[in-house]
Design a protein with these regions (language model features):
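Beta-propeller-forming repeat regions
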Residues: 1-457
């Protein structure tokens, strides 16, 4: 893809009915620049473009997929900067609806900011169709350390029309950058939501609230789970049972370099891990990395303090007790999230991560490269999965699964094509790697926010 870049992570579904999964991505140019290929669909068979859709700013989000027009093909709902939110017919790329940036709410004019990844929730307006839960926030025009920022909003949007059903400001009145995750409550039909506030330089909190409160337009009684005075909670959390009571618990990254676990029933802390001299802006990989049956966690944090973040540091944390079982420091800063699968049939998952590095030639010129690697926690070995390729990958999480139904692992990964710059929007490459690795069990965490794209393990 020439002249554009991507912060989006690939989603896969069959759009053209050939039985092979196709690839959906967001892309764009520099901030505030329009792009005619801001949303693209690529043929999974050969990489050719199936369709492209324009946007007024970067589409950095990762799509949610749902057949909203009842034609048997999943449609694409995807988000980006400057209040970009679109629903697109997956079959042909026709825009079903766009969020109207002039939308008033309760007869008041509003300023809309970035949308973050959408989630589907049960029907909220009695039209017989699921609706969209989504956050909007983050005023990029505010100076980095200015605490006076517009409050973010948690919204329910009609998936059929893009119209607002309800809107609730953040419970602490702060901004938000988090893609929320919702999970059915353990003792009712209610859906619980994890949301976060704050940013790179502004403290914030992690909250639990419910869809019914969002529908009322008031989440001021949200349950505070954790707070940081220095950094916010920006990375998507996960719902996963680590207490073996069949109730999903909550695991989340804090921007100040902590990994936190909370009981899904009583919401009390289970364990907390602090990674010194790091900050967390990526999400969490979930897998069975140790010998027991309790899911474990692999994270890649940024070393340093924003904006002076250059290197990455990786940790594997035992889900049973919060013990750090593995640590490494590999590569330059990247904000991608690892994915997980059993690559060698030893009944333990390996974590797959895109790693950035540089080389310096004889005239001290830097060249930037990336490589896909797997961490084998049973042998503590690092396994390269690809050759090194020119360019860096800052935020695009790989997708792993079976794209063509042959029961062998396929890997989709992206990176920029600029050999001499790390942050660039002048070209990126999408790769499909076909392996001979058999898939012996369902892959639960094979994409950003998991294989179902919803943050639920």
């Amino acid at each position: 893809m020439q002249g554009v870049g991507s912060f989006s992570s690939p989603r896969v579904t069959d759009l053209n009915g050939d039985g092979i999964g196709d690839i959906i991505l967001g892309s764009g140019r520099q901030e505030f620049q329009a792009c005619d290929s801001a949303i693209i669909a690529l043929n999974g068979l050969n990489g050719e473009m199936l369709w492209n859709v324009s946007a007024q700013d970067q589409i950095f989000g990762s799509a949610s997929l749902k057949d909203i027009n009842n034609d048997g093909i999943k449609d694409v709902i995807i988000n980006g900067r400057s209040a970009e939110l679109q629903a697109i017919d997956g079959r042909n790329g026709t825009v079903i609806w766009k969020f109207d940036k002039k939308t008033r709410y309760q007869n008041k004019a509003r300023k809309w900011f970035n949308f973050y990844n959408p989630q589907f929730i049960p029907d909220q307006n009695d039209d017989g169709h699921e609706d969209i839960l989504i956050t909007n926030g983050g005023d990029v025009m505010v100076e980095a350390f200015d605490p006076n920022r517009p409050a973010g909003n948690l919204m329910i949007i009609d998936a059929q029309s893009g119209k607002i059903i309800s809107l609730a400001p953040m419970p602490d009145g702060k901004e938000t950058y988090m893609s929320v995750s919702a999970c059915k409550n353990f003792d009712s039909d209610e859906y619980a939501i994890i949301l976060g506030t704050g940013g790179e330089t502004i403290g914030g909190s992690l909250f639990l609230t419910y869809v019914s409160d969002v529908l009322k337009g008031d989440i001021s009684n949200a349950i505070p789970l954790a707070t940081s005075q220095t950094n916010g909670f920006t990375a998507p959390p996960v719902w996963v049972d680590v207490t073996e009571d069949s109730i999903p618990d909550i695991v989340a990254n804090a921007g100040d370099g902590r990994l936190l676990a909370f009981n899904g029933k009583g919401h009390e802390p289970i364990w907390a891990v602090t990674m010194k001299d790091t900050e967390a802006y990526s999400s969490i990989s979930v897998g069975h990395f140790t010998e027991d049956n309790i899911p474990d966690f692999f994270v890649s944090y940024a070393q340093g303090s924003w904006p002076n973040l250059e290197w990455a540091k990786q940790f594997m944390v035992n889900g049973k007790n919060g013990k750090i079982e593995f640590t490494d420091s590999l590569g330059y800063l990247q904000l991608t999230t690892p994915v997980a699968a059993d690559l060698n049939s030893d009944y333990r998952d390996e974590a797959i991560l895109n790693m950035n590095f540089q080389q310096i030639d004889s005239i001290y010129r830097k060249s930037f490269y990336n490589i896909l690697v797997a961490f084998d926690f049973k042998t503590n070995k690092l396994i390269p999965l690809t050759e090194s390729l020119p360019g860096h990958n800052i935020t695009t999480t790989p997708w792993i699964g079976d794209i063509d139904g042959d029961n062998l692992l396929d890997i989709i990964y992206c990176h920029s094509t600029s050999e001499f710059q790390t942050y660039t929007f002048d070209g990126f490459q999408v790769n499909l790697l076909k392996t001979d690795i058999p898939i012996r069990k369902p892959i639960k965490w094979g994409a950003y926010m998991g294989s179902n794209y919803d943050g639920v393990y």
